[in-house]
Amino acid sequence: MNIPPYRTRIKFCGMTRVGDVRLASELGVDAVGLIFASGSSRLLTVSAACAIRRTVAPMVDVVALFQNNSADEIHTVVRTVRPTLLQFHGKEEDAFCRTFNVPYLKAIPMAGAEAKRICTRTLYLKYPNAAGFIFDSHLKGGTGQTFDWSRLPIDLHHPFLLAGGITPENVFDAIAATVPWGVDVSSGIELQPGIKDGDKMRQFVEEVRRADGRRLLGVP
């Protein structure tokens, strides 16, 4: 069985503005995600990412997100932006992901027929060195679409983040249903792609804390 975390970690992804990152830090968010995947509406240049990196508060993880990027591109980001975690959303294999000597998370798509074949053993065999997994509706991420949470692999002893259509309105139920290590949100706290909404950010954090408090009190 999974051991429930004492509290649910929070990752705000697709950050593009310094002010949004500062507010995330003030709200006690555990990690901020910076996207380097080509074609993303939240894509950052390395120079923009460095400017954001300088404003991140201590003890907040910086997660660099990639999707089928070249090794050279990733090495450049690792060297200049100095992320504390890497996140891979493409066809990257374990050997590639661990080349960069930074802990990594692997995104697993959960929508469609492909998700029916996902099991814990398969994940461990394919990504034995992953620090954790992110279960999202689609590989691309940031789609705002949910998936059937009952499809999550059972007996997963690695930390996992729940993503895909998570919002301030449904994150309480999502935590109650899946008891994740963390939740990962992007479009659910936005006014438009890359532009976060301060009120939604606050509400999201409040709902996560409410869910944690209810669980710790043993309230079903």
UniProtKB/Swiss-Prot annotation:
SUPFAM superfamilies: Ribulose-phoshate binding barrel (SSF51366). Its EC number is 5.3.1.24. CDD domains: PRAI. GO terms for biological process: L-tryptophan biosynthetic process. Transmembrane segments: none annotated. Keywords: Amino-acid biosynthesis, Aromatic amino acid biosynthesis, Isomerase, Tryptophan biosynthesis. It comes from the Bacteria. InterPro entries: Aldolase_TIM (IPR013785), PRAI_dom (IPR001240), RibuloseP-bd_barrel (IPR011060), TrpF_fam (IPR044643). This is N-(5'-phosphoribosyl)anthranilate isomerase. It comes from Xylella fastidiosa (strain Temecula1 / ATCC 700964). The gene is trpF.
